Amino acid sequence: MLLHLVLATWKPDVRAEDVAELAASVRRFADDIPEVLLVRAGADLEIQEHNADFGMAAVFADPSALGAFAAHPAHLAVSRRLATMVASVTRLQFSLADDDPIIGRPDPVKA
């Protein structure tokens, strides 16, 4: 299993409505893209300073599932939209143990 993270910092002209629309599109990945096992996205809560403005986390079975996700039309459309909004973006992938507590939990958004 692997966790894919995306952290974005917005350009000054990005509107809250644009962010809400983008977040909704990202959350639909779990329904639209079979390789996405779990996905979360949202704006920074501004609890600490020097954070990104927006983050996305998605779980995949393996690197090939991440590759299929990266090539999926729904992901490509969101990536194109994101590219118009960001001043900077950082991506990171790391391994999750198969017995990690995050795996196998019901998705509260779908429940």
Stretches found by the model and what they are:
Residues 1-53, 61-71, 94-111:
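Short S/T/G/P-rich N-terminal loop/turn motif that feeds into the first structured element of a domain
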Residues 88-89:
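Interfacial aromatic-anchored transmembrane helix boundaries in multi-pass membrane proteins
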Residues 70, 79-82:
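Short, flexible helix/strand-to-coil boundary loops that buttress conserved ligand/catalytic motifs
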